[in-house]
Amino acid sequence: MGASVKPAARRNARQFALQAIYSWQITKENVATIEEQFLTSGKYDEEEHRAAEPALAAPETDVSYFRDLLAGVVLNHNELDSKLRPFVSRPMQDLDMMELALLRLAMYEMTRREDVPYKVVINEAIELAKVFAAEDSHKFVNGVLDKAAPHVRKKA
């Protein structure tokens, strides 16, 4: 995997996984249905996101990484929430849905994708929060993940 992984392709996969996770949280639709919607929607509505964040709109996307993130978060959301809970200052049900999706995505990467450095996971979550979440959400996401990282990664 190592050197052949393109950061832009992973970034795109994270963006679309975040949107798909958010969609799943809202609709509770079958994950396969949501995945199919993203895979058949013409480059994941690339045009819509080009104006918001050009770096995220590159045509390449690591589709297998997208699938892993989406399925992994949906299948393990209860476990991910349990790992997040000690580091979140309010009840999980009170979190903004986009913040929850971001935290679940990042926690999945930190706990299940040890090939991705935890600093990369945190930075990518912050950047996604700046684009998709409320104005100061990136600060909240950063704080939670900074506190969680040493507890979920052996040498964080």
From Swiss-Prot:
Keywords: RNA-binding, Transcription, Transcription antitermination, Transcription regulation. InterPro entries: NusB-like_sf (IPR035926), NusB_fam (IPR011605), NusB_RsmB_TIM44 (IPR006027). GO terms for cellular component: cytosol. One of its GO terms (biological process) is DNA-templated transcription termination. It holds the Pfam family NusB. GO terms for molecular function: RNA binding. Involved in transcription antitermination. Required for transcription of ribosomal RNA (rRNA) genes. Binds specifically to the boxA antiterminator sequence of the ribosomal RNA (rrn) operons. Belongs to the NusB family. This is Transcription antitermination protein NusB. It comes from Vibrio cholerae serotype O1 (strain ATCC 39315 / El Tor Inaba N16961). The gene is nusB.
